[in-house]
From Swiss-Prot:
Pfam families per record: Trehalose_PPase
Gene name for this UniProt entry: TPP6
Pathway the protein contributes to: Glycan biosynthesis; trehalose biosynthesis
Annotated protein name in UniProt: Probable trehalose-phosphate phosphatase 6
Family affiliation: Belongs to the trehalose phosphatase family.
Cofactors named for this entry: a divalent metal cation
Statement: the UniProt record of this protein carries the keyword Hydrolase: yes
InterPro entries given in the database record: HAD-like_sf (IPR036412), HAD-SF_hydro_IIB (IPR006379), HAD_sf (IPR023214), OTSB-like (IPR044651), Trehalose_PPase (IPR003337)
Species assigned in the record: Oryza sativa subsp. japonica (Rice)
Catalytic reactions on record: alpha,alpha-trehalose 6-phosphate + H2O = alpha,alpha-trehalose + phosphate
Enzyme class: hydrolase
Protein origin, superkingdom: Eukaryota
NCBIfam families found in the cross-reference section: HAD-SF-IIB (TIGR01484), T6PP (TIGR00685)
Amino acid sequence: MTKQSVVVPEVAVPMPPNSAPLLPYPPPRAAPGVAVRKKYLQAQLDLGAGLPLINGWVESMRASSPTHAKAAAALAAAGAVDDERAAWMVRHPSALSKFEQIVAASKGKKIVMFLDYDGTLSPIVDDPDSAFMSDTMRRAVRSVAKHFPTAIVSGRCRDKVFEFVKLAELYYAGSHGMDIKGPAKASRHNKAKAKGVLFQPASEFLPMIEQVHDSLIERTKCIPGAKVENNKFCVSVHFRCVDEKSWSTLADIVKAELKDYPKLKLTQGRMVFEIRPTIKWDKGKALEFLLESLGFADCTNVLPVYIGDDRTDEDAFKVLRKRGQGIGILVSKYPKDTNASYSLQEPAEVMEFLLRLVEWERLSRARPKW
């Protein structure tokens, strides 16, 4: 292993050209005070900058914690942030209240669904191995897949998220899109080559990821509540159950591990650190790849709909904005800086949106064509 502190540039992976713009988006706007803070925290999370201030890590960890969320909820109940939330909801209205506007945008176009898993189809829980989706949510997703090409795009290992979802007719993109596989079960939406789709742009990093996983298992044994998860093409270090007093120590451990692997980078999700290859591949790239696999790379008659709750989903939201083509929906109860156009508060609202979409499609097909 090398001990260099050299920053390795991300390796670009060729992608199909973007489709022509269809739906012009207004420029994304942050909730008041969010953008400046985000830039500051990102500077602290930038491994290439050497992470000089561990306080930046801890602040970012605290910002994504349930305690922080509860405090925000308490402030909201007291009316302290009502104006801020109202302004945010104007910019990112509920996808349920604007449902007719969303389906109107799909006129003459093929809807393609992209769904995150944790926090979108399943609740956020302390133990990531217990993040089960309900049977009713599974039925809703199955119904959606009967009408629209549907993909699950998750930071989890592809095999693991399939064990949770258990629907063979879907596309699955695990490890933030670095492990993509087509449906194991044919449907009327799948192209002939769909079942053969298998894309793993970071295969060469697998031995390195395995080494980091095994090393962090040992290094984090001194941190009660820390959980290290091997997601095949990335390593996740969960701190949801770690005492806040130990966050700084945990961040130091993870940072120290990365010094031995300059070809890996560090990102952060909801109460989790994620160690990934430095290739330029993320959920946004996965979305583009899947559209190409479905035959929609250069089409103007497609409407991608992406629903997710995590900061890693922002890469997909950004792609939709750049294309000027598609609908990004953020799942969050609180105002966040986002590139999504619409919002839903929780998985229950996601399920309601999916069921309404299925019913709308069913009625549209039954309606006579004059």
